[in-house]
Amino acid sequence: MAYEDLIKSIESAAEEKKQEVLRNAEREVEAILREAETESSAIHAQYLEKAKRDLILENNRQKFLAKQEVKKRISAVRQKLIDDAFSRSKEKISGIRSDPSYPALYERLTREVISALAGEEIILHIDPADSKICSDVLKKTGIVCDIMQDITTIGGLSGTSADGRIRAYNTLESRMERIRDTSTLEIINLILGGPDG
């Protein structure tokens, strides 16, 4: 009987040990599952946070690109308005030679060229259509210089030093270009009522 009791005792101890191992295993499994769930939640939260950041960045990028496109289109419209304004201005002054005030304007333009080339031997470059007016202005002012009828312009003239190093452009076209280059902002303000329209 002692042998049977011993076997029962061993079996009972083995059963208890088995139950204890199973309980420990269940606790470990539960702990692992809780940890996995916590990690999964953290990973999910990180993924959501990254997705939110990515969406915000993409949204901001798209807004920036849209604003840039709007600015580009506004700039193109402004440039077209400026181009149109200068084209109309050029058309309006294209018949200036027939205006009674042209000789006085031509005299002023000639004096500006002469002044810009002061101290130099001067060559005036004129449109053949202005040869009479130019001769009259030079006689009136007493200025002596060479004249070359070698440019085509809607009005005005240019001049160079005899050696060609110094040039003074005073055609109406060159004056319009200078105005265009230096006064674009003012022109935009006049056309649109401000730099931002």
UniProtKB/Swiss-Prot annotation:
Location(s) in or outside the cell: Cell membrane
Principal location class: membrane
GO CC terms, sorted: plasma membrane; proton-transporting two-sector ATPase complex, catalytic domain
The organism's place on the tree of life at top rank: Archaea
Lipid bilayer topology: Peripheral membrane protein
Function in brief: Component of the A-type ATP synthase that produces ATP from ADP in the presence of a proton gradient across the membrane.
Similarity annotation: Belongs to the V-ATPase E subunit family.
Assembly: Has multiple subunits with at least A(3), B(3), C, D, E, F, H, I and proteolipid K(x).
Protein name: A-type ATP synthase subunit E 2
